[in-house]
């Protein structure tokens, strides 16, 4: 008997399956066939909704980065400057990638794939502008976007290498740097 196609429900199942599989196996090691089996959807349904595995990652990154700074705001709520929010969020991303190879894989892919990287750039540009515009009053949004391109390149570089094996003896040191 053919499965009834409910795109919202299928999308939810695919996203749920991908979150679990990406965290368990990493982005690179998760195969589309595993996603289809876990989500109990057909290849056609998957392709109609997301087209590719990168399409799922784009959706997840969009959801995550729309909330990421908001989740960190309480940690920097009493800080004397909005710059602290940016510093805490940056340190948190680096620490998370040091603690989990599968999260490292997801973040590196997100900072590499053009569609997801653009989501990160746009989201972070707004945060950079909010944090640093008082210190850089002559900068326009495009200037903050260019700054984000540079910092994102550095972030990807640091995420792609296991820092604790190179220079850092404890991943928590990243949190104390900022």
Residue ranges and their predicted role:
Residues 59, 70-103, 111, 121-123:
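Hydrophobic alpha-helical connector segments
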Residues 1-6:
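N-terminal intrinsically disordered/low-complexity leader segments
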Residues 109-160:
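Amphipathic alpha-helical packing segments from all-alpha helical-bundle domains
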Residues 13, 21-55, 59:
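Helix-turn-helix
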Residues 13, 88, 92, 146-153:
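Amphipathic alpha-helical interaction segments
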Residues 43, 63-71, 96-100, 104, ...:
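A short secondary-structure junction motif
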Residues 166-177:
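Single conserved hydrophobic/aromatic residue that forms the stacking wall/gate
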């Amino acid at each position: 008997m053919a499965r009834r196609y409910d795109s919202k429900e299928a999308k939810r199942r695919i996203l749920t399956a991908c979150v679990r599989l990406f965290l368990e196996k990493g982005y690179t090691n998760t195969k589309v066939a595993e996603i289809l089996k876990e989500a109990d959807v057909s290849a056609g349904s998957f392709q109609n909704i997301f087209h590719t595995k990168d399409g799922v990652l784009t959706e997840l990154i969009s959801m995550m980065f729309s909330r990421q700074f908001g989740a960190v705001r309480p940690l920097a709520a009493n800080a004397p400057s909005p710059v602290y929010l940016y510093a805490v969020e940056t340190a948190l991303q680096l620490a998370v990638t040091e603690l989990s190879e599968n999260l490292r894989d997801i973040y590196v892919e997100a900072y590499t794939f053009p569609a997801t990287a653009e989501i990160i750039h746009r989201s972070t540009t707004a945060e950079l502008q909010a944090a640093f515009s008082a210190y850089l009053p002559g900068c326009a949004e495009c200037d903050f976007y260019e700054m984000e391109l540079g910092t994102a390149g550095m972030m990807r570089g640091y995420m792609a290498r296991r820092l604790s094996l190179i220079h850092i003896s404890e991943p928590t040191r990243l949190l104390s740097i900022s």
